[in-house]
Regions:
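Alpha-solenoid HEAT/Armadillo-like helical repeat scaffolds in large eukaryotic proteins
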Residues: 9-17, 39-48, 71-79, 102-110, ...
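Eukaryotic acidic, Ser/Thr-rich intrinsically disordered low-complexity regions
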Residues: 170-224
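Structural detector for internal amphipathic alpha-helices that build alpha-solenoid repeat scaffolds
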Residues: 1-4, 12, 19-32, 42-43, ...
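Short, acidic/turn-prone active-site loops that include or flank metal/cofactor-
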Residues: 113
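Ankyrin-repeat and related helical/solenoid repeat scaffolds used for protein-protein interactions
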Residues: 133-184
Length: 224
């Protein structure tokens, strides 16, 4: 069977009921064909299986950027949350920094947690040299947001910016919101030791916020 026939079969397989059949999308990456980009992007928006989505992203990275980037940029304003998050994921894998202005801003504050998390990761990966401090200032506005997984994602994104994140996190430590202060402390601790257990860092941050630790992380002496 020639590559054109393989491509047609792979595109048709994207709508199959069985995820194992939909995984044939990998054929679209083996024989890159710009004509299939619309089908791939559309499927990303609705595909329920993580592994199939990952294969769709891989196939997109194999296509010409002149074709994929406009399609993925358009998905960033989709009403479907999965369309936005998958477009962000694919853009981060394509790794073309020209899309950075399309990511920073409202997507970093997207009401959908999965979209916001994808935006944080993509922004850190694609931030041009010299933009890290400004990005950190944007990211710290989300401190205290969501559950443990969401907070860990934001902490990791800020840690990915390295020392450029310290000034913004220092401001977060002085926030009037205790959740923001706790999250900022935990992130600074993670920045100091990226391999540390995050749950332990959060507990230490809580003690800092509660005033039971001094700035060096030592237990305060109880008052006489």
């Amino acid at each position: 069977m020639n590559p054109v026939q393989n491509t047609h079969r792979a595109v048709a397989a994207l709508g199959a009921e069985a995820s194992s059949t939909r995984l044939r999308a990998m054929l679209l990456g083996r024989h890159p064909d710009p004509s299939v980009v619309t089908a791939l992007v559309q499927r990303c928006a609705v595909e329920p299986d993580f592994f199939v989505r990952d294969m769709l992203t891989w196939a997109l990275t194999r296509l010409p950027e002149a074709v994929t980037l406009p399609k993925l940029r358009a998905e960033l304003t989709s009403e479907q949350a999965q369309a936005r998050s998958q477009a962000l994921h694919s853009l981060s894998k394509i790794n073309n920094r020209s899309v950075y202005p399309s990511i920073v801003g409202t997507l970093l504050r997207d009401p959908d947690d999965e979209v916001a998390r994808a935006a944080w990761r993509a922004a850190v990966a694609l931030a041009p040299e010299g933009e890290q401090r400004a990005l950190a200032a944007e990211l710290v506005t989300q401190l205290g947001r969501g559950d443990r997984d969401v907070r860990l994602s934001l902490s990791r994104a800020l840690v990915g910016l390295g020392a450029a994140a310290r000034p913004a996190l220092a401001a977060g430590v002085n926030s009037p919101d205790p959740r923001t202060r706790e999250h900022a402390h935990a992130t600074l601790l993670l920045l100091r030791d990226p391999e540390a257990d995050y749950a332990e860092l959060v507990e230490e941050a809580r003690r800092l916020v509660a005033g039971r630790l001094d700035p060096m992380g030592r237990e305060k002496e109880p008052p006489c």
